[in-house]
Amino acid sequence: MYLLRRLKKLTVTDIISYSAFFLMYPIGILYKQYLKIRRKSFWLICEDEYGANDNGYHFFGYMCRYQKQKPVFYVLNRKSRYYEEVNKIGNVIRWGSLRHWLYYLSAQSIISTQLGSSPSLKTFFPLEIIGVLQNKRVFLQHGVLLNYYESLNYTNNKLSCIICGAKPEYEYIKSSFGFSEKAVVYTGLARFDELHDYKKQENLIIIMPTWRSWLTQNGVACEEKIKFTDSQYYKEFNGLLNNAQFIEFVEKNNLQVLFYLHRAMQQYVSSFKSRSSNITIVKRFDKDIQNLLKEASFMITDYSSVSVDFAYMKKPLIYFQFDQEKFKKYHGRKGYFSYQDNGFGPTAENVESVIEFLKKSYKNNFRLEKLYEERA
């Protein structure tokens, strides 16, 4: 069912990609055999088309600095703001280029933070699922898994290996998603290595909600199809950004607030506004997300796994969860993690509760409470 839903969304561009695949496939196989004869191999590393600030980037940097004997290549769009930075570290392949096609087909391992790292997701992914392509694919993940997602079932991705960032997550994936025991590896996340040298700004607050499948163009639709600005998601978060009590507290204490949408929701970033100059709506590539996590003193999120990164640095946060039932029904079903029993901060269903905890945390000099510190 999962694969069929993806195939139903094929476009003319996808059909062109299939044609390109059938042209490049025999060349890629021949090149792979040539490398095998020469006893050579390489790894292909990436995140998404424009990204280089997550586990893929940090793993690539580690390989280039400390494991130079192994050839690695990073795949990135030439227009990415990170392109020159990554190019200084090691070898970069332009996303979508013929070289990307060739190397994807001939790499010993494809290592990515996303399930889709090929030149054409709709071309390669079904062929990987049915076994036509049997390349080794390693999923670095882009955060610690907290909820259950259908896409992570082994039958829906045929991943060779999945990396885990936390022990409970590791045990959960081993038992619940159909992977062999050796395919699930607990190493921690590469990006966590960069969270030890943080220097926080005492007056910086970040708001980082995750996405909603029913509000994204390529997501799974639910029965409610409405204009985005009529959605509860928009009303709650935009309401927080313009709440009189919130603005008064922020301005009175000279706090700076940055609102940073998940990449899947960035299409709606222009819909959000605030009447306070202390509150800034951030576009995806205007700020580096990891730097924001390191600099901020307090976080407001909803269900996002960035809360784990924040708790890793022993910083306070709150989960603003106004749509719990709908989220569990249409986006990510409840897994091993309970936000109430295992979370790194309290949960709130309304703006007033969020503001109340923010004030409490501010009075405590943004120190993480003992209960949540023990959980972290």
Where are these regions (language model features)?
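Short loop/turn segments at strand-loop or loop-helix junctions that form parts
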Residues: 46-47, 108, 113-115, 141-143, ...
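Catalytic binding pocket for nucleotide-activated donors in carbohydrate/polymer assembly enzymes
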Residues: 271-276, 303-376
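Membrane-proximal basic amphipathic "stem/tether" segments
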Residues: 1-47
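A short, gly/pro- and small-residue-rich
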Residues: 123-143, 224-235, 315-326
